[in-house]
């Protein structure tokens, strides 16, 4: 309700595919979370169509769970179908624990697309716990996803996913995309300046990122209208 009053253009509700994680993280079963989905959908429907926020069902622990271990692909698909059936505008896949690998990303996306349609899954939320974050980004891009979650300095994590680090690092992600000539609209120099602000404000938080540590390559000039072409063979 507060998000809608504030004019949020997008709202995401997390649904852990691992019910053990759901009960630990949200203190709710799948059934209880789905009840919340119905309430939010009903609330959104009371608004004029041009004022309705986009409502995403985020499928947490879609690639594995530190509490349950393996999460079956069929269970992820089942939960995606339920969220769409109840009225979510789209679903998103989240590698909460950093278990995913590139082949798994492609297979999972294809399975969910087959169930709910490509228009209902456009984004993915990745962690770099085991060093596969950007490799998974490449798999997601290759298959056609265009919404990639990340966080400045890789901040974040989940208290109920022991050992999981934060999201993929925004600074590294933007450099990766820009160096391949993909437009992000994000100024790398200004992004690095923001990192300095956060580092000063949170001196006890570990900040991650290879690009900030190594700095941009010598002679690298960003062009915000679509990258530099580095790494494209030019």
Each language-model region and where it sits:
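Catalytic cores and adjacent flexible loops of soluble metabolic enzymes
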Residues: 1-234
